[in-house]
Amino acid sequence: MKINRQRFESLMHELIDENPLACQGILSILRIEYTDQVPSLAVSLEEPPRLLINLDFLIEHTTQEIHVKSVLLHEFLHVLLNHTEQFKQMDRATNIALDAIINHIIHRSQGEDYSEFFRIYYQGQKGYASLLRPDPHGTTTDDRTLERLHLDLLSGSVVVDDLLDLVREIRKEEPAPLQLAPGLPG
């Protein structure tokens, strides 16, 4: 999708006008930075959080305006859910767990059009990373725990304790922890 700073900011303002969650999220962010220092979009783990935007990511991976709004809403939800205050460091396992919860919140609250971006972007993910993809039409796996997590994420029945259990399970599979800023690539 062809997008520049002006178009991005226009879409951000549209999202804020359309969505109370986005409006609350942006009120907590004092600064927006365009940078290639993050692979996608991210909110910094500091007070107050900064919204970091890699326009090249949006150009390469979004095909519709609603995709840009979905990614923005995803970042705003990190702020609204206090992830920027609760977590001062982010490893891959925690990032996957938090992003999976957020992507499914977007699916449940905004519908399939909004969650389409995450289904497309994460379509090739396997194992716990497949939880990043809200797929209401079913995800098939031989792993019963993973299948149950998919269903629980879709229904909204995953709570913080489940999220922390998920992080512990993901860490068991990780050979070494990766330090990542929160953001989409997970």
Each language-model region and where it sits:
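Short, functionally important secondary-structure microenvironments
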Residues: 1-69, 75-186
